[in-house]
A protein has these predicted regions:
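Ligand-binding pockets and gating/stacking loops
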Residues: 1-458
Length: 458
């Protein structure tokens, strides 16, 4: 007797697969596509620390900052535009203890001891630059390349450029660590002006990880399949008479994907099959790290099963935004995030997945060397740190530098456009070759700007 999962899969492959089968591979927007050139990475996991973590207290030590603490930044630095306007506030010392880790001797603060153990896998970019000085613009740009809304997110561009290797799971998945609203909300994982089939699919906690996926108990599987087939026939007839309305094909594929996900998605998000040792590796055995540990483990399971792009929001609702009390704020957040992310790196490596899985860590900007409200730091898009690991990246290296106080990038500046171009390059996609025509215009993911930093590769 067929299980429900097997029946759903077989139904999707037979007459019920009308929406998918009626579209040839060339017309199917989610069909797997070849990269433009040899790829080093096949998939991406982006750990997004919403609110802006302090680079000065994590990956970019500044002895001069402590030496001159309590004094204003020298006049030679000129005017600094900050959202709170406190550019003349005294410099705030970092209370962190630093050590060099791995064979590379990569400096990491005592806030991140577990990630530090993977120093030789990390390429720390200390010279990131963005344009948004507030959260809405900064988060929007780090996701879409623009401080203005309405453009496709990086995950949507990857889905468009590479398609999916598993028709039963979303190509692009988004998760967050709490119930607070992420700044900008779904706009961050939107497909913008591209068909909605490329947008991110939310996965959440609780009994229903994927909202609205489960069929109501009163509706039988065969009944649901029949309704979908009938709707598909009507829509295909309409599409034949209105061939210019290509959005309909994308809608049909969305319906079909939702049906097929009912078979495979529940297994993909079922963590009961993971060993206790694996759960402990991710920190799921401790209250402080359980939530983020679960998300990181889910990310591994999704990419393992073919999802192209997974984004995890940590500190959703701008929790990393430490305008005051940075010691308490970052101590708690780093503890909640450090072990789970380190566990993800270790697990990917043990399974042979890290070599072609690109892991990205960072927020929309960093924090200022100047104090705010006495014991906090303001937003700093002028020079901050992110890191990448796996996916062809050469670990154990530091890229770029900020000035003596960590205010501005001064060497090997990498704008958000350069960062996005680098991610696409590692995936085998040329940022100028990846084009979507919208209203007659050739649109590109980096707005025709930026260059990949190819030296990041080993």
């Amino acid at each position: 007797m067929l299980s429900r999962r097997d029946w759903l899969l077989s139904a999707g492959a037979g007459f019920g697969g009308l929406a998918l089968n009626a579209l040839h591979a060339a017309d199917n927007p989610l069909a797997a596509k070849k990269p433009h050139f040899a790829a080093k990475a096949k998939r991406v996991i982006f750990v997004f620390l919403e609110g802006g973590p302090s680079h000065l207290d994590t990956f970019d030590p500044k002895p001069a900052l402590n030496k001159h603490a309590g004094k204003p930044i020298p006049d030679s630095f000129g005017s600094v535009i900050l959202p709170m306007g406190e550019s003349r506030s005294p410099l705030l010392a970092s209370k962190r203890k630093w050590a060099k880790y791995g064979r590379s001797g990569l400096p990491v603060s005592d806030w991140l001891p577990h990630i530090a153990a993977h120093a030789d896998d990390l390429a720390v970019i200390r010279s990131c630059v963005a344009d948004g000085i507030n959260h809405s613009a900064g988060v929007c740009q780090m996701n879409s390349g623009s401080i203005l809304g309405g453009r496709p997110s990086l995950g949507a561009w990857v889905s468009y450029g590479l398609g999916t290797v598993n028709a039963n799971l979303p190509a692009f998945v988004v998760m967050q660590d709490n119930q607070s609203s992420v700044v900008n909300g779904p706009r961050n994982w939107s497909a913008g002006f591209m068909p909605a089939v490329y947008q991110g699919t939310r996965i959440q906690g609780g009994a229903e990880p994927i909202p609205n996926l489960n069929t109501p108990e009163a509706v039988a599987d065969a009944q649901q399949r029949g309704k979908l087939d009938l709707l598909t026939r009507f829509n295909r007839d309409f599409a034949a008479k209105h061939p210019a309305q290509t959005e309909l094909d994308a809608r049909l594929l969305s319906y079909e994907l939702a049906f097929r996900m009912q078979a495979e998605a529940p297994e993909a998000v079922d963590l009961t099959k993971e060993t206790e040792a694996t759960k402990a590796l991710y920190g799921m055995d401790a209250k402080e790290t359980a939530t983020m540990g679960r998300l990181c483990l889910l990310a591994r399971r999704m990419v393992e099963r073919g999802t192209r792009f997974v984004q995890i929001y940590h500190g959703a609702g701008s929790k990393w935004d430490a305008h005051s009390g940075i010691e308490k704020n970052h101590t708690e957040l780093c503890k909640a995030m450090d072990k789970p992310v380190a566990g993800l790196l270790a697990d990917l490596k043990a399974r042979g997945l890290l070599d072609d899985t690109l892991v990205i860590w960072g927020g929309e900007f960093g924090r200022t060397p100047m104090s705010e409200k006495g014991d906090g730091r303001d937003h700093n898009p002028y020079g901050f740190s992110m890191w990448m690991a796996g996916g062809g990246v050469k670990g154990g290296q530091v890229i770029g530098a900020t000035d003596e106080f960590g205010l501005r990038a001064v060497d090997a500046k990498l704008h958000v456009h350069d960062l996005h171009a680098t991610v696409l390059w590692l995936l085998g996609l040329g940022h100028m070759d990846l084009v979507y025509r919208y209203k007659g215009r050739p649109e590109r993911p980096t707005l025709n700007e930026g260059d990949p930093y190819t030296k990041i590769a080993g």
